[in-house]
A protein has these predicted regions:
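Flavin-dependent oxidoreductase catalytic cores
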Residues: 1-326
Length: 326
């Protein structure tokens, strides 16, 4: 876990991944600031192997908050390249999380009427979205493709598509937010994942893009609406076929049992894919970390937010794990 390894032709100094944060330290146009670079550099300096940025909007219409990081325009490239160089100077690798807010934004923030799979309003600070049409779908796919190109151009080691956090792709995947009756509707898992898979496939088909693709998602809220273990198997199969390289499932606690089985979500996914996994969910003690070590196919371990609050926690954890492994 704390030793160097190689994956996808990339050399990582260890398997620890610093969690993405929603610091919103970019300027009002989404451009990287000096404060943002200092924030991420301080985390990388602790010794983690990989940094993952907060969600970066792939299009202005997909911006979810003021100060959110952007990767939608050429003007974002210079700052992003400075961020990448600063992190790599500290010895860590870095990925960027690509997102589109969908209905979870407002006209004040994104500059237009929010767009989502169906009409929806997330509450007082948001606006009622309009339903995306075929033209919107084509544009959204291109936004993600161009963002992937920019990420590779400035030197990011991988991208992560955000399929969680109740953002656009999660909205499509959830029957709570998606009540369409067309090919992108909620009737089947394939339909609910159609936009996601089209985005990933389009990135894969782009000859100028060879960057590894991680996919971030959560299913526990869907389980309340009838999502089953069979649905999970179908989800993994569809995502693999589209071109996902890494699965990053999120759970409130990484070892919580899933589908009334004896296994956690991470374990179930590991049994049904050959792709490497990211272990994420309340890993904030040596005991939990050692427990997760026994799960097959885990490539990265996301340290909990304690890493942000206690500057020396990484070295403390490293020593504790080493002591308990003796």
């Amino acid at each position: 876990m704390f030793t160097p390894f190689e994956a996808f032709g990339i050399k990582f100094r260890n398997q620890i991944l610093a969690p993405p944060t929603k610091e919103n330290l970019a300027n009002h146009r989404g451009i990287v600031t000096g404060e943002m670079i200092r924030h991420y550099s301080a985390l990388a300096k602790q010794g983690v192997g990989t940094m993952l940025t907060e969600s970066a909007f792939v299009a202005r219409q997909g911006k979810m908050a003021a100060g959110q990081l952007g990767i939608s325009e050429e003007e974002h490239l210079e700052g992003l390249e400075k961020l990448v160089k600063a992190i790599k100077k500290e010895g860590a690798c870095i990925g960027i999380k690509l997102s589109h807010a969908g209905a979870r934004t407002s006209e004040e923030v994104c500059g237009e009427n929010p767009v989502g799979p169906s009409l929806y309003n997330f509450g007082r600070d948001f606006d009622l979205s309009r339903e995306f049409d075929e033209g919107d779908i084509e544009e959204i796919i291109l936004h993600f493709v161009h963002a992937a190109e920019r990420a590779q151009e400035v030197g990011f080691d991988f991208i992560e598509i955000n399929g969680g956090d109740q953002l656009l792709l999660d909205q499509c995947f959830s029957v709570r937010f998606n009540n369409r009756d067309d090919d992108y509707g909620s009737e089947t898992i394939e339909n609910r994942l159609r936009l996601t898979c089209q985005i990933i496939q389009a990135i894969r088909d782009r000859k100028s893009v060879s960057i590894p693709i991680s996919y971030y998602f959560s299913i526990f809220d869907k389980m309340e609406d009838g999502f089953s273990i069979t649905n999970l198997h179908e989800t993994l199969e569809l995502l693999e076929k589209s071109g996902v390289d890494i699965f990053h499932p999120f759970a409130v606690h990484v070892m919580n049992r899933c589908f009334d089985s004896e296994e956690s979500l991470l374990e179930l996914i590991g049994l049904n894919t050959e792709r490497p996994l990211v272990a994420d969910g309340n890993i904030k003690s040596p005991q939990v970390l050692l427990e997760v070590l026994n799960i097959d196919k885990v490539g990265w371990y996301v340290l909990e937010k304690t890493l942000l609050a206690r500057p020396n926690w990484f070295n403390f954890l490293k020593k504790k794990v080493a002591d308990q492994e003796k």
